[in-house]
Amino acid sequence: MDHAARIGLEVIITDHHECGHSQLPRAVAVIDCKQDGDPYPNKDLAGVGVALKLACACEGDSGKVLEQYADLVAVGTVADVMPLVGENRSLVRRGLKKLGTSPRPGIAAMMRESSIDASKLTASTIGFSLAPRLNAAGRLGQAETAAELLMTTDPRAATELAVALCELNRQRQNIETEIWHEANAQLSGTVPDAPIVLASDRWHQGVIGIAASRLAEQYSLPAIMICLNGDTGKGSCRSFGGFNLFEALNACSEHLMGFGGHALAAGLNIKLDKLNDFRAALARYYRANKPAALPEVQCDLLINDPALLSIDNVRALDRLEPYGNANPRPMMCVCGVSLEALSEVGSGRHLRMRIRLRSEHFEAIFFSHTAKELGLREGGLVDLAFTPQINEFRGRVSVQLVVCAARRHDGRELCKGILENRQDMLWAAAEFCPDRADFVRVWRMIQHQDFSAGDTAEAVLAQCPEGMEPERFCICLAVFLETGLLSSPGGSVYGAREAHIEGKADLESTEIIRLLRTC
């Protein structure tokens, strides 16, 4: 900027990052609503949003400018993961409408090459399909390719540029995977307890940010990856769990050549001989300021009836678009469902699942995760947090679950519900409906010992026969209680003992078995 001033070049700077505490660059104007004292109410504009405001001010006709550039503002706002609330939400909604009806040639070509139906474009489509392809060019040092795509009016040139960007994105994915594997090798299988700070002279500067995001999610910690060049390095930083990266870097700035960004993502420059000091200082700051607890997945609805996931119901959720950061799609969950099939897709980067909920089957996809790291296996039970979406493939329309979190099912809560006669939980126990052999085995156990079910779920489960699922054992006890084979003063399995009734009990006619058979 000093050189620009010396040669008489007038420069206007637009930005949306934190300004820090250093002196602002010498320019005709610095436009950033995060400057101290700036009165503009929306502090979460994307960089493209700030540029739009400048264009509106220069043109004097905001409506005209927005009509011309709403599509680019939408793409940039979603790509930069800005909160989709308030003004940002309105801007993206306006841009999606333009993208769906009259996209510029470059974006239209990109949507064709990405197999995106423009009439069904959503903010999520931008975030997961369009934005990565556009960003790939800049990450690999060819930003002009993306710029040309967005500016061209020639449909043929647009197609050629879109093909080139898709190829660059494939290269970016391969480089990212290599970096991620190398980063894990540096960690040597250890589980760090402070922000991850890794460095290498083998990594690609434009891709380390994506790898850092993946590491942050994998280890539930902030991650910083530094690309070394001689005795200096440039790093990309990604937060996790609400930890404010910008404030952390500011607190450790004595070890840095410079830094910038915001709470969730930042960049830095560092001398190689300061790396260890910086890592130690950041660890100390993290331990003193780390979030009180890791963020939990907050689900809006527990699905226990597959009819809730009908195509019509899922399509109705689209009326609330655009979804995104700070305005996510409704999160739903299923618990204790059968995991019928597992397969890796996308060269092993993603996990496809087929689950069974009562009598219905659903396909699910979990991006950037594997069955091994999650500890999942076919035939097991799983809890999933997900957003439902419509999937159309070869003329077939179905509901697909886009998984946000997965874990092996812990049957203790289900067992507790069965023992306490909570019929609202029986749907999740259909997999464990006992057969005659199960009933015989449990009854013989009861008869051959002075059986008492115990006063807690833990005491009951401690008596489960070896090799039998705890849920199946609990159902057997609940059925025996319903038929009178067991008696209990409190009406639940807790404290139940053998009742010594005369005659045979019809186990299959019990309400519990009837409900389980219909699940």
Residue ranges: model-predicted function:
Residues 1-24, 30-32, 178-186, 216:
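N-terminal small/polar loop signature for handling phosphorylated ligands or for N-terminal nucleophile
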Residues 24-78:
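Short alpha-helices
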Residues 7, 59-277, 345:
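Hydrophobic helix-and-loop "lid/oligomerization" segment in the mid-to-C-terminal part
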Residues 3, 50-54, 91-94, 277, ...:
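Alpha-helical scaffold elements adjacent to nucleotide-binding pockets in ATP/GTP-utilizing enzyme cores
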Residues 17-22, 29, 37-39, 230-233, ...:
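Short gly/pro/ser/thr-enriched loop/turn and capping motifs at secondary-structure boundaries
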Residues 157-161, 168-199, 251-519:
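Mid-to-C-terminal polyanion-binding domains and interfaces
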Residues 16-17, 33, 81, 136:
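Generic detector of well-ordered alpha-helical packing
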Residues 1-2, 48, 206-210:
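Glycine-centered tight-turn and secondary-structure capping sites
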